[in-house]
Swiss-Prot record:
This is Glutamate 5-kinase. It comes from the Bacteria. Belongs to the glutamate 5-kinase family. InterPro entries: AceGlu_kinase-like_sf, Asp/Glu/Uridylate_kinase, G5K_ProB, Glu/AcGlu_kinase, Glu_5kinase, Glu_5kinase/COase_Synthase, Glutamate_5-kinase_CS, PUA. Substrate binds at residues 55, 142, 154. Keywords: Amino-acid biosynthesis, ATP-binding, Cytoplasm, Kinase, Nucleotide-binding, Proline biosynthesis, Transferase. GO terms for cellular component: cytosol. PROSITE patterns: GLUTAMATE_5_KINASE, PUA. It is found in: Cytoplasm. The gene is proB. It holds the Pfam family AA_kinase. The keyword Signal does not apply. It catalyses: L-glutamate + ATP = L-glutamyl 5-phosphate + ADP.
Amino acid sequence: MREILKNVRRLVVKIGSSSLTHPETGKINLAAMERFVRECADLKNAGFEVIIVSSGAIAAGMGRLALPEKPKNLPEKQACAAVGQGVLMHLYEKFFSEYQVIAAQVLLTGEDLAVRKRFLNAKHTFSALLNYGVVPVVNENDTVAVEEIRFGDNDTLSARVAVLVEADLLVLLSDIDGLYTADPRKNSNARFLPEVLEINEEIEQLAGGSGTAVGTGGMETKIEAAKIAVNAGIPMVIARADYGNLRRILRGEEVGTFFYPKKKKQWKKQWLLSGARVQGSIIVDLGAEEALCSGGKSLLPSGVLGVEGEFPTGAIVAVKNLKGRVIAKGLTNYAAQDILKIKGLHSWEIADVLGHKDYDEIIHRDNLVLVD
């Protein structure tokens, strides 16, 4: 199955803080960073399109500010990120320039990928950068993006970027070889998993909190990234950030843990799964669940039991079954308050209740994507 990696031309590579810093001091490891840039530059010069999602801004800020340990409160973390992002980007520009490659800084927040208009604008910007032959270096805008600092969002950010740029592959480089049955640093009996066919409950349970002193993410966020990528039809590999591993992965060698992709979805449905901000939920009955999941139908008011939250027309909503499990996401044709009035009714009754009928469906099937 790894044979598909030989056809990759556009890849997103996320490198973690632990792979760019000295473990003793938390400061930037210049030799490690130079080796990483050299391999990416070599891939670029060989005809690959490379997008980097780089952690390390907070760690770089710690070094510049001479802090002995990672700050614990949010304002100090954001201050470190503000100082460190400039340091980090200066180093990327310096190292890439040695190989005649231009690097560009791209700072994103969750909002940039959650709002469709901003998502499209970011998509066009990346397209222009790649057409210019530039290597985009992406980071969460740590200074303002509270969620990233709290939850280690660069793993899932990289998956969202992979969806955004329609990448052929996502690679997460870390200080660990891939996914194990237990943390190999704590359990000598841990067994390495070279491939994951499906991200089921068992796989999710294997992901423990293994963040490092300078990083914010662990295996749990990497599994979340894998869900986003494979559901969008993008294969993903978790591997150790050793020099040469990217080349080996692209040759189809068994490096790291390979996550098998699912069938590629239309870009709108990829956005709904990966970046769109959910504003509320619609609860459906068994008949509607079957119609959506097995019949590929639109969601009609007759199958709706209720709503959660308040949301306007055109909002992104989750569709939940009777057990509370999210089975789909979609763009709603009606606001929450109107859905409450027409739930359980036939489509021809909508106008009688609301005084107008803009659509027969609550969510049209073209604007709905199933959550696997």
